[in-house]
Regions:
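NAD(P)H-binding glycine-rich loop region in Rossmannoid oxidoreductase-like domains
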Residues: 1, 9-16
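A short helix->loop->beta-strand "cap" motif at the edges of active sites that frequently abuts
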Residues: 1-3, 35-36
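Conserved beta-strand edge residues that scaffold enzyme active sites
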Residues: 10-11, 45, 135
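Oxidoreductase cofactor-interface core, primarily capturing Rossmann-like NAD(P)-dependent enzymes
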Residues: 15-124, 148-151
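Short, Φ-rich (hydrophobic/aromatic) sequence segments
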Residues: 59, 160-161
Length: 237
């Protein structure tokens, strides 16, 4: 094996990490300390159908016009389109084979989690969502609530919500020296959402892998996605 490429999670260098983020960071460190040169890409929320973090945004925004939420909805995150993540992963083979390090990767937008939900609402043709931050809503309670109002399994919701207690933004842009961004730039958040939804001009609102508007697009749902990925939109709210 000549090179390991691992996709980890963005996380602050100092402070307490959730078990989920700490585990991903530990896996990256194991690879970096191995005898095989390793590139560890650290990304925040990946925007594309099937991404658990994106699917949680999708389901909560579609179902709830009014939403009690933990204080982490005010935290800053730097989402990245799945096609940009795949581009980095594929072009990692062009990086000096002796290089052994982490790289932060993220899209051009730094948003609060609540802003991401309302950005999704705009692209989905839904009214703006009203989000109330409640300091007493713990991550555990929030995950129970998410699993009740959405098809996201509790065992998926718990680590995602716990990891959102930290700001997840890019702290360095060294990757640009090795893999320059595309000429048109990395995809903005709302553009990435639009691609993930694959909405048709005629008003088709439900996306399936059989009827995706761009065949083979990385933002499209896949047959291997879990049952809760890529559900249609709720227009009643």
């Amino acid at each position: 094996m000549g090179r390991i490429v691992y996709l980890g999670g963005l996380h602050p260098e100092e402070g307490h990490l959730s078990k989920h983020l700490a585990s991903r960071a530990a896996v990256g460190e194991l690879f970096l300390y191995s005898p095989v040169p390793t590139i560890v890409f650290q990304a925040g929320i990946v925007i594309g159908s099937g991404s658990a973090s994106f699917e949680m945004i999708r389901h909560l925004t579609e179902v709830l016009p009014y939403m009690p939420a933990p204080h982490w909805v005010r935290n800053h995150v730097q989402p990245i389109a799945i096609r940009d993540v795949l581009r980095y992963l594929l072009l990692a083979v062009s990086i000096d084979e002796e290089l052994n390090r982490t790289f932060d990767i993220g899209g051009p937008d730094i948003l609060r989690y609540g802003q991401m939900m309302n950005g999704y609402a705009v692209e989905a043709g839904l009214p703006q969502r009203h989000i109330a931050s409640l300091p007493v809503l713990t991550p555990w309670l929030a995950s129970q609530w998410v699993s009740l109002v959405s098809p996201i399994p509790r065992q998926i919701a718990v680590p995602i919500i716990a990891s959102l207690q930290n700001d997840c933004v890019v702290s360095e842009h060294d990757i640009d020296r090795y893999i320059p961004p595309p000429v048109e730039g990395l995809l903005p958040y709302r553009t990435a959402v639009r691609l993930a939804l694959s909405r048709e001009a005629g008003g088709e609102v439900e996306t399936s892998w059989q009827s995706a508007t761009v065949p083979g697009a990385p933002s499209d749902p896949l047959p291997s996605d879990p049952d809760w990925a890529g559900h249609g939109l709720h227009r009643s709210a």
